[in-house]
Amino acid sequence: MMRKPYHCLRSLGTALTLLLLPSLSSSPLLAQSSENVCRIGLHYKVLGEGTNSKSIPVLTVVQPFGPAAVGGFFPGDLITQIDGVPTTGLTKQQISELLASPVGEHLLTIVRIGSGTTARILRPSCKAPYALTERELATAFSGYSPMDQAKQQRTLSFSFESSAPFDWSQAKTFAFAPSEGEHRDLYDIVYGQIAGLLEARGLTQQANSPDLILECSRSDAEGGARLSLQVTSPSKLNQTLWSGTSSLPKGTKEAQLYARQAIPVMLQSFPYLTASQVGYTEQTSRYLYTGILYDSRDLSRIVDVEEGSPAFTAGLRVGDKVLRINGKPLSPTTVRELSSRYRNFLDETYRYRSAEAVRPEQAPWKSSDYGSIRKALEKDKYASVFSYLFFFRPYINETEQTELIFEIERHSETYTLSIAPVLRDETVFIPQ
């Protein structure tokens, strides 16, 4: 295969600059203060916006490991107040402005199924504008492992209905209808998924006198197999409080695997309806986390180490200079030069990609060429030191050992530290 010239990758400098731009939208993940870039880690929709004065925001996505997740927030939480300001009737822009205000913490009053009304603290995660997190670097160097860094539009065949008014804040317990028939194994998998999700939100599973009854059913229609989840109340058995329906693959094993993946997405906004049918943006992000923040002005400089992180535990501190990671020198240290080396790597290893893609770095690697990819990554001319973020993949590391060896300089002395990174999967499905 002829080497395809690399033309369409943005420079790493541009990519990193874009990553640091303030982002303030109707569903904010970032907030911006005058000095720092602050991350909130949540997405929301406004129920009833533009239809009446009782519109209210509901969380649709909580970013794994983000501030909202640390603060104990869950998808499906209704936000009734932000720092004492009622959210009823506010627009998306007004809610964004409240969440983006430059404060050390926000007090959010929420209504949650199973828990009623509670108040929780949301502490934004802030960093200097020149600080680069490993999350940002994994995105910038996505070509090392495209299967772990991707963003795509997904049409998941979900449909939702809600036909009876119900005070969900008063629901404390739930039970499942008996699993029977030839699809019992599928129902058991689905019920197990649902139980974990509902219990995490504060509901209790009990067989006697539950507040909610959940029942799964599989059906075959002209368009293919469908899986339906129906929620009723013993006091209103003839009325469906909430229902969700999804398509299913034909094979039994395929259907069970799909159910494991789809049910958490289907229940993201449960028990509220943000739309009858929903499209999603799938943001895939997996990388090895140590907790280091690098200086974009000199990438070898550590500008912060998250407290309690693997790097902090290993002894790395602010001001340390990283010389090598797993034997690879952290050089060059400028974004511009490192970008040039990275582009050369993508261009000169394109023959190892297994498929065409809109951007070459998005195509996966051929499994038969993993050895060649590892050899290329060892070449100093490519300066692939940040491939450590994907050290859990066989085309980066042929062993199962993910320990990272950092050689650092501190006060003119050289030290070698061993760090046990944590594999983070921050993949989310964001409803459009």
Placement of each model-derived feature along the sequence:
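Bacterial N-terminal signal peptides that target proteins for export
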Residues: 2-16, 25
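PDZ/PDZ-like peptide-tail recognition elements
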Residues: 29-61, 97-98, 130-147, 256-306, ...
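A structural "domain/chain start" motif
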Residues: 42, 50-55, 71, 130-189, ...
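Conserved PDZ fold ligand-binding element
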Residues: 68-90, 313-339, 346-350, 373-377
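N-terminal segment of the mature soluble domain
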Residues: 170-218, 338
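Amphipathic beta-strand/beta-sheet edge segments enriched in Tyr/Trp
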Residues: 218-257
